[in-house]
């Protein structure tokens, strides 16, 4: 495995390995403090930013140092896994004839560097294991997005439509990974606020000290993070939570992998 960039002092930890970015060990503030967070949200007249009740409360989480993919896993990368393992191709079970599905073992022409979508949680987990990696936990994903300064979106605290591939931009499909250089966290991780949503390793559960009760909590749904080309600026926030059964496939859902630092 090649080591790129520099070594973190005497700890023997590279800032980047094979397309993965190092996220340092430490505490960070996870979640949201209340149902309405006030402040600058883009200068469009809104005086507050609505948050999901499952994001509450704001709490401190300790995360060990780890690596995370700089970009979402692409069609071209997934194709190597598909060819090597004979995995079921990424096809939307609800719309099997849609033009965005893989055909005859191939992804749509010209979409080599688009994020792979229509993969189940099990597909994503299997790919990461095949690549000697793993899926990131929900906490790891949020820390990677918020950076060291607790941003609302990967790029800052004000939403700017042109910075990210969400519904507001009306591109109506994913774009090649890294196409939006501003959609980049302070750690250097791209497309966390837009393009496609991403599976995580975590079960969908309430946060510590939360009294929220939902039938969807528990070991039945996996957490999905990030915004997508079909979702709004609210879903694009680093703290926004979504979920699905592990068997779910959707044209807005992809993933990226993580790896332990040691």
Predicted regions and their residues:
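Short, compositionally biased
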Residues: 1-91, 121-122, 149, 158, ...
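Functional-site microenvironments in short loops/helix caps that host divalent-cation chemistry
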Residues: 22-23, 29, 34-50, 88-90, ...
């Amino acid at each position: 495995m090649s080591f790129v960039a520099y070594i973190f002092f005497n700890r023997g930890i590279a800032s980047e390995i094979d397309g993965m970015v190092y996220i340092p060990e430490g505490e960070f503030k996870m979640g949201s403090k209340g149902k309405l967070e006030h402040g600058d949200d883009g200068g469009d007249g809104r005086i507050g930013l609505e948050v999901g009740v499952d994001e509450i409360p704001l709490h401190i989480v300790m995360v060990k140092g780890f690596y995370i993919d700089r970009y979402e896993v692409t069609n071209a990368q997934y194709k190597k896994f598909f060819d090597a393992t004979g995995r079921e191709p990424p096809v939307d079970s609800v719309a099997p004839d849609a033009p965005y599905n893989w055909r005859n073992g191939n992804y749509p022409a010209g979409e080599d560097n688009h994020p792979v979508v229509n993969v189940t949680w099990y597909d994503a987990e299997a790919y990461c294991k095949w690549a000697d990696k793993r899926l990131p936990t929900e906490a790891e994903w949020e820390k990677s997005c918020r950076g060291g300064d607790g941003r609302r979106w990967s790029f800052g605290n004000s939403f700017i439509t042109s910075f990210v591939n969400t519904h507001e931009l009306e591109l109506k499909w994913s774009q090649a990974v890294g196409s939006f250089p501003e959609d980049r966290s302070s750690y250097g991780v791209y497309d966390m606020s837009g393009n496609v949503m991403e599976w995580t390793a975590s079960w969908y559960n309430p946060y510590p000290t939360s009294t929220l009760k939902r039938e969807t909590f528990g070991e039945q749904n996996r957490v999905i993070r990030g915004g997508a080309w079909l979702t709004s600026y609210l879903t694009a926030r680093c703290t926004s939570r979504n979920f699905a059964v592990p068997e779910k496939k959707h044209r807005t859902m992809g993933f990226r992998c993580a790896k332990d630092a040691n």
